[in-house]
Regions:
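Loop-to-helix transition at the N-terminal end of transmembrane alpha-helices
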Residues: 33-51
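Membrane-interface helix-boundary motifs at transmembrane edges
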Residues: 2-4, 57-67, 90-92, 120-128, ...
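Membrane-embedded alpha-helical segments in integral membrane proteins
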Residues: 16-31, 77-89, 226-231
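Alpha-helical transmembrane segments
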Residues: 7-23, 46-47, 70-81, 105-106, ...
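Short, hydrophobic transmembrane alpha-helix segments
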Residues: 24-38, 57-65, 86-93, 319
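Juxtamembrane helix-loop-helix connectors linking adjacent transmembrane helices
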Residues: 32-35, 83-196, 203-209, 235-243, ...
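C-terminal membrane module of polytopic membrane proteins
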Residues: 238-244, 265-270, 274-319
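Membrane-interface helix/loop boundary segments of multi-pass membrane proteins
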Residues: 192-222, 234, 260-268
Length: 319
């Protein structure tokens, strides 16, 4: 997949400029005690929207226009709601955003499944073979991530560890794990929104310039820094430096693994989309809550995360 400076510029403006331009609004929301979750949801749409807008403006031939326009329209709606949420009463904004995600995801499947196969193949949207390999990769990812969560809780010891084991003896995590399966099909678009930008577009662009390994690492760094507005005003406002460091650790190492998975399965974009979905959504299963805002992160947490993620995922850089 070849690109040029004009397309890269459009991508960068959508993927990076918009999130950073949202920082004053995030600050306003934080100062006024308003929920900033909708900004995080909207930001996931921007990378793919940048790719799609770049391709459409370049008048590339044979683009899947219906799907592209749908995603861009959904992105515009999410962006508009984010802006409005900073100034208008917040009741209902997140519910409306979730409704938009569901409707857009369902329409997305319809447009994709009724699109010509040649268009899907030309623009990296086909579900390729090697499904058994993809399944093995997903199982590995779930197993090691679950083990990492258990290890982190075990290191806390005492009542925290006992309570966590008791949580797994209830039906809650198992029911939530089952619910996540159909939920993927109703909410895939934000995760696709990131992976189509990072893995399908930016990774090969940087690998062509810097080589396969350095290109994958560079995307991981850029992906991590892309989260900076959320690190400052959503994930961990009180320990933002630690949050940024932890984000870089996670994005560089997971970026290596997601790129490995993408290329191992014949550049099948749907595998990193599923992996990204599992990484984000399984938090509900692992912890019993979907709230990832206002975290308190220590430098010890960052160091432990760097060791675990580095040991588990960085070796795939050599694969």
């Amino acid at each position: 997949m070849k690109t040029n400076k004009k397309e890269l510029t459009v991508f960068a403006l959508c993927a990076y400029a918009i999130p950073f331009l949202m920082m004053p609004l995030l600050y306003i929301c934080l100062q006024n005690g308003r929920d900033t979750s909708i900004f995080a949801n909207a930001q996931m749409f921007y990378p793919a929207a940048g790719v799609m807008l770049a391709f459409l403006l370049a008048r590339r031939q044979g683009t899947p226009k219906r799907f592209y326009i749908l995603h861009i329209a959904a992105t515009a709606l999410m962006l508009a709601m984010s802006v409005l949420s900073a100034f208008l009463p917040q009741e209902g904004w997140l519910n409306i955003a979730n409704f938009v995600i569901i409707i857009a995801s369902v329409l997305g499947w319809i447009f994709l499944l009724t699109e010509k196969k040649t268009k899907r193949e030309d623009y990296g949207l086909c579900l390729h073979g090697k499904l058994l390999t993809a399944l093995v990769i997903c199982v590995y990812f779930l197993a090691v991530k679950t083990a990492m969560v258990f290890l982190s809780m075990a290191m806390q010891g005492g009542d925290s560890w006992a309570e966590y084991l008791a949580y797994w003896r209830t039906s809650a995590p198992w029911v939530m794990a089952v619910v996540l399966v159909p939920n993927f099909f109703l909410s895939f678009l934000p995760f696709f929104g990131e992976e189509y930008g990072w893995r399908y577009y930016l990774t090969p662009a940087l690998q062509g310039r810097f080589g396969a390994r350095r290109g994958a690492l560079a995307v991981g760094v850029l992906w991590g820094l892309w989260h900076l507005p959320l690190n400052l005003f959503f994930y961990s406002p009180d320990t933002s430096l630690q949050s940024i460091a932890a984000q870089l650790v996670v994005c560089v190492t997971l970026g290596v693994f997601f790129t490995f998975a993408y290329e191992k399965c014949g550049k099948n974009i749907w595998l990193p989309v599923v992996l990204h979905y599992l990484n984000n959504s399984m938090v509900l299963v692992w912890t019993g809550t979907a709230d990832i805002s206002n975290q308190i992160i220590s430098w010890t947490d960052v160091a432990i995360s760097a060791i675990m993620y580095g040991v588990v995922f960085l070796p795939f850089l050599a694969a």
